[in-house]
Every structure is written in structure tokens, then in C-alpha cells.
């Protein structure tokens, strides 16, 4: 009997080390940044069983077999659609400003589609304005509405949006609503999905969270886009979820969420429409390619409109394109660079680019919320402050709520707004969308918003920051080490 126990123990020990060796090899063979690989290996070696399970759940980009197959199947038709769109030459910009030229070239080469001109654009800086505008535009819809959000939380003006959507669906407007399963969990537990479906709205739960399938698909891969498309002509996107801040996360202790949304009219809606169609087909298998814009009847403002490039990121889209876009934007700065983000956990490349810009004499501002809804990300963000401050970056901690706006403004001319946080999940994992606007008028609008944020912020003084308690530095370094995993 003793011999049997000994054999069993040796077999278990051998299996244990074989499992660790196998996962280690798997980590090393995947193409990833060295800091990320080292962080995963540290977790696996310190807490082997917990580390292995965590890695299998969250360590690899896995869309799931069915979605991955759909993602591959949709590209031939999508590529043909993009080629057909290029035939509408009047909607594509042929010139860009000096600061924007490299970024637009990058996006065109990586995505196959250039910047679109002739768009009218309005920056909505309050959730009330954005929600009321949505209610109005949805009520005017004639043909179709496509909506995708990470979070849909009932309450306040959001309920008016829901009622408007159901009303137009009842009169025959084709309405599609796709919401992330994790972000909109409260919505899917509410009566609204049944009410909307009864009204004729096609409601889809994206990337369904299921404990039975945790090892078959990465559970923290989320549908993080925020888009509303109306009649293939009106479009919205930005940092705002479908929530009324007066009713959203009031017990989090961070104040109301502060966001921006962009309302657009013009061919940019077509570019956003193909992104939605890809997401919809990946999730449902249904192909819904948007119609090409009719340049003969749509009132595109060729002379006064904005030039916009749409960047889509996530599984099935050009890998790393948003990361490249941010790097290109930062290195293009010559006078001023202003960035706002709720979560500041940049890659090494982005960190060095920001520091280099400041050391070249560019006036660099980063605006982050003083109080964050994620303790882990809050500590990890502070771990980068010392290096940024030493390089000459001005860091502002916003005190008027949870600043959720994601924006970049380069030299007052080149603007980036959308859903992308400066963290690893947004940069490399989630389905995201970013608008690139080459226009000094829009840049002036965004600058006014950012200046208001700065006025409501506290500037971090390097000397004061250097005197923070030693225990805080220890906690910061701990989270800094694991920042590639956040």
C-alpha cells in the first residue's frame, strides 16, 4: 500500500510540474510583449494552480470557435464592399494637414480605407445633451437604426431612448440593438429585452458570459464600442455608455461620470456601418452589409465638412492598429499634446513616446480622474506618474467626478476621440472604435472641453509627489509589475 501511495504521489508531482512546464511553454510561444509574458510567468510560479487557471481564462485572445469562423468568413465580402466604396471617390479626402498626414496614411494602409470628408460634426459634452439628441434623432428615423453599447443601464433619460426606439420599431423602422453581456447584465435581467423584442427591436446579447464555457472563450474580451447609426447617415460615438449619470453607479463614491459624444452626419456613418455589420455577423451569423452612400442625393458638405478617419480595433480587425495610431499621433506633436483617459496603464512604447514628446519640448498634459471606480487600475496608474513627471509631463487629477472621456489632441489640429482607454485591454483585446479628425475647428471645440477639465483638476507637483509615503510606493510598484495584465 505504501508503494502505491508513493507511486501516486510521484505521478501527481510529475503531472503538476508537467502542467506548469506546459503552460510556461504556451506563454513563451505566444507572440506578446516581454513584460506581459514575464508577469504571467511570475503569477504562474508564485501561485501555480491559481495562476494556471487564470492564464487559461484570461491569458490568450480566444474569440471562440464559432465567432472565429464567422470572423474569417465575413472578410471576402467585406473586402469587396470596401473596394466598391472606393468607387465613391468624392467622399474620400486627398489632402491632410502636416500633423495628420502620417496617421491617415497608416490607417489607410492598415485598414484599406482612407479618411472621409464632407461630414458635419457636433461635440456633445454633457450626457443630457447626448441623450436628448438621441431621442430626437431616433424619433426621426425612417429606415434603420443600429446600436451597440458596452453598458445599457435603465433609468432617467435612458428610458426615453428605449421608448423612442420601441416606438419607431412599431412603425416599421428596422432596429438592431447589440449590448455586451457583462457590461449590460442588469439590462438583460430587466423587463426591457422582452419589451423591445415585442415591439420589433432585434436585441442581441454580445459575447455571452457563461460559466459552462469559461475555458472555451476569453471572458474578459468585451464588446466595448459605443455607436448609434440612423438611416446610414447620422452617427454617434464617443466615451458615453447608454447611462444617465444621475442614476448610474451612485454608490461607487466617485461622483457622476463625465463623458463626450460626437454626433455626425455624412459618409462617416457608412464607415461605421461596416464596423457594425462585422460585429453583428460575428455575433449572429447574419450578413447585413450597409448600402453604399449615394453621393448624388446625400448633402455632403465638401467645402466645410470635417475629414474623419474611423479606426476599428479588436479580434478580426487589423492587429495593433490603435496602438500604432496613438504612437504616430504622439510622435507627430510639435507644440502641444493633451490626453484624457480614465485608466492610465500604457504600454512601454506609449510611455516612452509620451515622455519623449515632453523631453523634446512639447507641452504634454495628461488628465485623469482623481478617484477611480477600479482600485487596481487606480494604483497601477499612479505607478507611472513618477516617470512621467520626471520627463516634464503635466498630470492633472480631475476632481469633478469620474472623468471617463477618452481623447487626444495634437497641436490643436489632430483629434482622436472614441472608446479606447490607455490600458492593455482597450489597446490589444476589446472591440473598440476611435475617430480621427483632421480639423482645427473641431480641435478648438475639443480644446475648450479639455481646458474645462484642467480648470476642474488638481495639478500634481513633482516635489510633492516625490514625498508621498513609502508604503504607497511599494503598492504602486506591485501593481506596476502586474500592469501588463490589467
From Swiss-Prot:
Principal subcellular localisation of the protein: membrane
Catalysed reactions, as listed in the record: 2 a 1,2-diacyl-sn-glycero-3-phospho-(1'-sn-glycerol) = a cardiolipin + glycerol
Regions that span the bilayer: 3-23, 38-58
E.C. no: 2.7.8.-
Residues forming the catalytic site: 224, 226, 231, 404, 406, 411
Keyword Phosphoprotein: no
Gene Ontology biological process: cardiolipin biosynthetic process
Protein keywords: Cell inner membrane, Cell membrane, Lipid biosynthesis, Lipid metabolism, Membrane, Phospholipid biosynthesis, Phospholipid metabolism, Repeat, Transferase, Transmembrane, Transmembrane helix
Domain of life (superkingdom): Bacteria
Annotated compartments: Cell inner membrane
GO cellular component: a single term: plasma membrane
Entry membrane topology: Multi-pass membrane protein
Classification via InterPro entries: Cardiolipin_synthase (IPR022924), CL_synthase_A (IPR030840), CLS_N (IPR027379), PLD-like_dom (IPR025202), PLipase_D/transphosphatidylase (IPR001736)
A Pfam cross-reference name: PLDc_2
GO molecular function: cardiolipin synthase activity
Gene3D superfamilies per the UniProt record, alphabetical: Endonuclease Chain A
HAMAP family hit by this protein: Cardiolipin_synth_ClsA (MF_00190)
Function: Catalyzes the reversible phosphatidyl group transfer from one phosphatidylglycerol molecule to another to form cardiolipin (CL) (diphosphatidylglycerol) and glycerol.
Protein family (similarity comment): Belongs to the phospholipase D family. Cardiolipin synthase subfamily. ClsA sub-subfamily.
UniProt protein name: Cardiolipin synthase A
Organism annotation: Sodalis glossinidius (strain morsitans)
Taxonomic lineage from the root: Bacteria, Pseudomonadati, Pseudomonadota, Gammaproteobacteria, Enterobacterales
Amino acid at each position: 500500500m505504501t508503494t502505491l501511495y508513493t507511486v501516486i504521489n510521484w505521478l501527481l508531482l510529475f503531472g503538476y510540474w508537467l502542467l506548469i512546464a506546459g503552460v510556461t511553454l504556451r506563454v513563451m510561444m505566444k507572440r506578446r510583449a516581454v513584460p506581459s509574458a514575464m508577469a504571467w510567468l511570475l503569477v504562474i510560479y508564485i501561485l501555480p494552480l491559481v495562476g494556471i487557471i487564470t492564464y487559461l481564462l484570461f491569458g490568450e485572445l480566444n474569440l471562440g470557435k464559432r465567432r472565429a469562423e464567422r470572423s474569417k468568413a465575413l472578410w471576402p465580402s467585406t473586402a469587396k464592399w470596401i473596394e466598391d466604396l472606393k468607387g465613391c471617390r468624392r467622399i474620400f479626402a486627398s489632402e491632410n494637414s502636416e500633423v495628420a498626414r502620417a496617421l491617415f496614411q497608416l490607417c489607410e494602409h492598415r485598414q484599406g480605407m482612407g479618411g472621409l470628408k464632407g461630414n458635419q460634426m457636433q461635440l456633445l459634452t454633457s450626457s443630457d445633451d447626448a441623450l436628448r439628441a438621441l431621442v430626437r434623432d431616433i424619433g426621426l428615423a425612417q429606415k434603420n437604426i443600429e446600436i451597440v453599447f458596452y453598458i445599457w443601464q435603465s433609468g432617467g433619460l435612458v428610458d426615453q431612448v428605449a421608448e423612442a426606439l420601441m416606438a419607431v420599431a412599431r412603425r416599421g423602422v428596422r432596429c438592431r440593438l447589440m449590448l455586451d453581456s457583462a457590461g449590460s447584465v442588469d439590462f438583460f435581467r430587466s423587463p426591457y429585452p422582452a419589451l423591445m423584442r415585442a415591439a420589433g427591436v432585434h436585441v442581441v446579447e454580445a459575447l455571452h458570459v457563461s460559466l459552462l464555457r469559461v475555458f472555451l472563450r476569453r471572458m474578459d474580451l468585451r464588446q466595448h464600442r459605443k455607436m448609434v447609426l440612423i438611416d446610414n447617415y447620422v452617427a454617434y460615438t464617443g466615451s458615453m455608455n447608454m447611462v444617465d449619470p444621475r442614476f448610474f453607479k451612485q454608490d461607487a463614491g466617485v461622483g457622476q461620470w463625465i463623458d463626450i459624444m460626437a454626433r455626425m452626419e455624412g459618409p462617416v456613418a457608412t464607415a461605421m456601418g461596416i464596423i457594425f455589420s462585422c460585429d453583428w455577423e460575428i455575433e449572429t451569423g447574419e450578413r447585413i452589409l450597409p448600402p453604399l452612400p449615394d453621393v448624388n442625393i446625400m448633402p455632403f458638405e465638401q467645402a466645410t465638412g470635417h475629414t474623419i478617419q474611423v479606426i476599428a480595433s479588436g479580434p478580426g480587425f487589423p492587429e495593433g492598429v490603435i496602438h500604432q495610431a496613438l504612437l504616430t499621433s504622439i510622435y507627430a506633436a510639435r507644440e502641444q499634446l493633451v490626453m484624457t483617459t480614465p485608466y492610465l496603464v500604457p504600454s512601454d512604447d506609449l510611455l516612452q513616446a509620451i515622455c519623449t514628446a515632453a523631453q523634446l519640448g512639447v507641452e504634454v498634459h495628461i488628465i485623469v480622474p482623481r478617484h477611480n471606480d477600479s482600485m487596481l487600475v487606480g494604483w497601477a496608474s499612479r505607478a507611472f506618474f513618477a516617470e512621467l513627471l520626471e520627463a516634464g509631463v503635466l498630470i492633472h487629477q480631475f476632481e469633478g467626478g469620474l472623468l471617463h472621456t477618452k481623447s487626444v489632441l495634437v497641436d490643436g489640429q489632430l483629434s482622436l476621440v472614441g472608446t479606447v482607454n490607455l490600458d492593455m485591454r482597450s489597446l490589444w483585446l476589446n472591440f473598440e472604435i476611435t475617430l480621427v479628425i483632421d480639423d482645427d475647428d473641431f480641435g478648438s471645440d475639443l480644446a475648450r472641453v479639455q481646458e474645462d477639465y484642467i480648470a476642474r483638476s488638481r495639478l500634481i507637483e513633482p516635489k510633492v509627489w516625490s514625498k508621498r509615503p513609502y508604503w504607497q510606493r511599494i503598492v504602486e510598484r506591485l501593481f506596476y509589475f502586474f500592469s501588463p495584465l490589467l
